[in-house]
């Protein structure tokens, strides 16, 4: 099993969306996706394609790069919660918590409560 780490940049998101039918059918790859932009449309469409093709994706719910660098951990967690719950189905998308020095016990508890 291979777990490539994707930073959710536009080209990575589009590549994942277009490869979802092939990758889902082979079931040998489970990408970890950390969004880098607060705009959710492209990432949401990609996650919906992965869900439709049964491609397991590990979605970082509390991203920390680019658009999220200046957000408090609780704010990025809330952003991720909204993205995750906006998906019509979530059987193949798994919420994932990014561990790091800014992660507080309160954010960890909130993640456990939500997911």
Protein language model annotation of sequence segments:
Residues 31:
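Conserved, mostly hydrophobic/aromatic
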Residues 51-114:
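A broadly used, surface-exposed interaction patch
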Residues 14-21, 41-54:
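Histidine-anchored nucleotide/phosphate-binding helix
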């Amino acid at each position: 099993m291979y777990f490539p780490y994707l930073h959710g940049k536009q080209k990575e998101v589009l590549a994942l969306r277009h490869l979802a039918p092939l990758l889902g059918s082979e079931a040998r790859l489970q990408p970890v996706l950390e969004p880098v932009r607060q705009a959710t449309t492209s990432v949401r469409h990609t996650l919906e394609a992965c869900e439709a093709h049964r491609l397991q994706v590990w979605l970082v719910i509390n991203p920390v790069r680019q658009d999220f660098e200046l957000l408090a951990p609780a704010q990025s967690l809330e952003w991720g919660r909204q993205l995750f719950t906006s998906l019509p189905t979530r059987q193949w998308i798994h919420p994932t918590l990014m561990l790091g020095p800014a992660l507080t016990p309160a954010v960890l508890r909130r993640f456990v409560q939500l997911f």
